[in-house]
Amino acid sequence: MQEVYLCLDVGGTEIKAAPLDKRGNFLAPVRHFPAMAGADRQTLLENFGWIFSSICPENAVPIEIDLAFPGPFDYKNGICLLQGLDKYDALYGCNLRRAFSEISGLLEQKIQFINDAVAFALGEMAFGQATQAGRALFVAVGTGCGSAFGVNGFLAEEGTPGVPPNGYFYNAPFRDSCVDDYISRRGLEKLSGEMLGVPLDGRALAERIAAGDERAKACFRCFGEQLCDALQPQIEAFCPDTLCMGGQIMASAALFLHPLEKLCTNKKITLYMTQDTSLRTMQGLTRAASR
């Protein structure tokens, strides 16, 4: 029987999942499942169990379950620490490694968790646009601002000059708050609420721009300036030669990325936009499994 890795990219709205082999090849198309993130603990665990069984091909045996999970999360011990973020509150304090082991029948050591931005970085360094990078910075803009740093194809070690603790800078001071409050979906919605009178996400803003709304265009430009300002200290501290940007908002990159493009040009940094972050994230999970 074929050995497979069951890989899940866990989001607050949906969970993307697929079986992969040890070389990072997809053995079936990526499937989308409702996250049910506001449900009770038992319902959530049953939902994960259903996903595990649904994506495992016939005549295949799962040898590992790998999950890209948003933080805060105790990745080493498999304990969910999400609380007060309107997603998976019922799993707070739950040992998901033990729970998923009981659900799947796999040994606990075969259930692995990794930060979603780190998985994205591993996928890009092994399969994507950063395979030749010497020093690479990875930023995924979604419900928050995820980040990771790479050196010569590997995650930067703790203590590497220019790399913040754990590779995270979502909580770095920025303007009157922190990076995460500005460079995120909620940051864009807050900005559009201030400028347009109604909170809009990236897709809704892009639709308004396509309809000729100049105020929506100005809002995206302002977001792009904030993004550049937030990343500049990290770029100057780490001195990457490659910057990979991910997240669903990258579908609208042409509407807001100009300030960052200009900064990268001035600093001779190669800038890449990843159109399907989940694909790279799931491939990155197989790299994490093989480490």
Which residues does each predicted region cover?
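Conserved phosphate-binding loops in N-terminal lobes of ATP-dependent enzymes
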Residues: 2-71, 76
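Active-site glycine-centered loops adjacent to acidic/histidine catalytic or metal-binding residues
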Residues: 9, 116, 142
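Short glycine-rich anion-binding loops that position phosphate/pyrophosphate groups of nucleotides
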Residues: 13, 70-73, 142-146, 249
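Glycine/GP-enriched mid-protein hinge/lid loop-to-helix segment characteristic of carbohydrate kinases
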Residues: 18-20, 29-31, 40-41, 91, ...
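Adenine-nucleotide phosphate-binding core of ATP-dependent small-molecule kinases
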Residues: 31, 36-57, 61-63, 177-181, ...
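Glycine-rich phosphate-binding loop and adjoining helix at the ATP-binding site
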Residues: 34-37, 41-49, 61-65, 71-135, ...
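Short, hydrophobic alpha-helical segments
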Residues: 52, 56, 286-291
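Conserved phosphate-binding/catalytic loops in two-lobed NTP-binding clefts
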Residues: 107-111, 257-286
